[in-house]
Amino acid sequence: MKRLQIKLNAFESLDSTNTYLKKLAAEGASEGTVVIANAQTAGRGRMGRSFASAQGLGVYMSLLLRPDCAASCAQSLTANTAAAVCMAIETVSGVKPEIKWVNDLYLKGKKICGILCESAVSGDKLDYAVIGIGLNVITRPEDFPEELRHTAGSIYSQTGLIIERGKLISAILTELGGMYAAWCEDKSAYLNEYKSRCTMLGRVVTVISPDGDYDALAKDITPDFGLVVETVDGETRTLHSGEISVKI
C-alpha cells in the first residue's frame, strides 16, 4: 500500500501555496511535499476565483502528489480529498461538514473550505497533482470581505468552536495519507463517504452552462464522481465539470 512521506515547508505568508508548490513540483520536488502558509496574499479557488486567506485565521496548505494514473483521474482525486478533509474536520471538531459538488465544504449553509487540484500531464498521464486546501477555522464574519459575508463562514462562525489549527493540519494530513493509499488502489474508494455528505442529492439545483442555465434534480454521484441530474423534461445527464447552485 502506498504511503506518503510528508515533507513540510511552512511560511508566514505566500501569494498562494498552490502557486509556490507548483514551482517546486516543476523543479522536481518529491511526492508528499507540503507547503503551509499563515496567510495568502493571492489565494486562488476554482474557475479563477480568489480565496480570502486572512492572517492566522485558517489553514492554507497544498500537497504534492505524483500518482501513476491517467490524467482523467484528477477529478476523482479532488472528490476523494473533499471527503477526507470532511472526515478530518469531524474528527477534531465533532461537527459534520457537507459537500457541494464537486469540492466545496459547507457547514450550516455557509462555505468553510475550498479545494483546488491543479495538475501537469505528460501525454495522457498525470505528471503531478497539487492539491490546495483553504479552510476557514476561526474567521469571524467581519473578517471576510463584505461581498463574501453572506456565503462564507468558518468552523468558529458556524459553531462557536475555537479549534487549534495545528490539530486540524495534523488530522488533515493523516486523513489525506489514508485516502491517497486507498485511492491508488481504487479511484472511488471514498465514494460512499462522499455521497453521504453530498446533501444536494435529492434537491433541485441550477446548472450553470455556457448553453444556458437550467434547473434539474440532483440524483446521484457516479463512481468517477460525475453528478447525475434529471432535467424538467425527464432527460438524465451526467456532469463532469461546471458550476451548480442549490435551490433554497
Each language-model region and where it sits:
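Conserved RNA-binding domains used in RNP assembly and mRNA/RNA metabolism
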Residues: L201-I248
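Residue-level signal for inorganic ion chemistry
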Residues: T17, G43, M61, V85, ...
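Preference for bulky hydrophobic residues occupying beta-strand positions
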Residues: M61-L63, I99, C117, I131-L135, ...
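Conserved, helical-rich catalytic subdomain that frames metal- and/or nucleotide-binding sites
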Residues: Q158-D211, K247
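N-terminal lobe of the biotin/lipoate ligase/transferase fold
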Residues: M1-V92, K111-C113, A120, I163, ...
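Beta-strand scaffold of nucleotide-dependent catalytic cores
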Residues: I36, G114-L116, V130-I131, P141
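Short, acidic (Asp/Glu-rich) active-site segment that either coordinates a divalent metal cofactor
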Residues: D124-Y156
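Acidic (Asp/Glu) carboxylate-rich active-site/surface patches
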Residues: M87-D124, G134
